[in-house]
Amino acid sequence: GRGVFARRKLKSGMVLGEIQGQIFPVEPDDPSYCMELPSGRVLEPAAPLRFLNHSCDPNCELFYWFDEDGSLQEDRLWLQTIRSINAGDELLIDYCWPADAAIPCRCGTPDCRGWIVDPEELHLLPRQEAPGALPRQTTPDSPAAGG
């Protein structure tokens, strides 16, 4: 698959840029890369940021910009780092999909939820590991290890 990678070391809290692309009033026929905006419209990002991959332990996040008067710029979405990132590391976001759109996650992080889903909606999904998810790491004292 594709991804987006840092060309140089990035500091935590850096605004990397605006997610630009085509805005649709409704979800297009192929919504694979689309992001819902607060206005209810849908943004289909342009390359390269359309290739941001998911992780349950992301190093970047998406945010909405507010004008000086505090009003939300509803159709403007930005990307920023949430921790330091080394040159060559992949930029990763948490997709936070609603439970009704969740799919199995294979990010492989120690805190993988097993599903690509908004953490606040994880309780709506089956408690067992998602089919095909990488096994969670266990320690000798963890319940999964029998300790």
Predicted regions and their residues:
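C-terminal SET catalytic tail plus cysteine-rich post-SET Zn-binding segment of SAM-dependent SET-domain
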Residues: 56, 61-147
